[in-house]
């Protein structure tokens, strides 16, 4: 799915991430993994920026790694089921003093 031209463009072959990475069609991979250390980014030669939990399993060292907190452990958050049936508030259990991924992304956007 692409929204590059302002409207949804669905083409399962054209926008297949595995194919795009293999063919080096992207400039960079931005990988967000704040829930589990097992959600590692794909191994690719494309430069990769990772916003992830400490201990995230990485297939290779990314160009940039920014540690972020886990919602419900390091900061408050909200867990939404994929089918949008249930939305659960998550409390900050104070495990670590790591920022929410949303704050990091907002800071990156503000710097651009």
Q: Would you name each region that the model predicts?
A:
Residues 2-112:
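Non-catalytic alpha/beta scaffold blocks inside enzyme catalytic domains
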């Amino acid at each position: 799915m692409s929204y590059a031209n302002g409207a949804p463009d669905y083409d399962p072959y054209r926008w297949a991430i595995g194919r795009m990475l293999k063919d080096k069609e992207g400039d960079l991979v931005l990988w967000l993994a704040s829930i589990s250390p097992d959600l590692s980014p794909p191994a690719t030669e494309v430069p990769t920026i990772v916003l992830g939990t400490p201990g995230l399993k990485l297939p290779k060292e990314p160009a940039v790694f920014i540690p972020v907190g886990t919602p419900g452990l390091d900061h408050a958050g909200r867990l939404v089921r994929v089918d949008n049936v249930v939305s659960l508030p998550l409390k900050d259990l104070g495990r670590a003093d790591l920022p929410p991924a949303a704050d990091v992304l907002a800071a990156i956007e503000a710097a651009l």
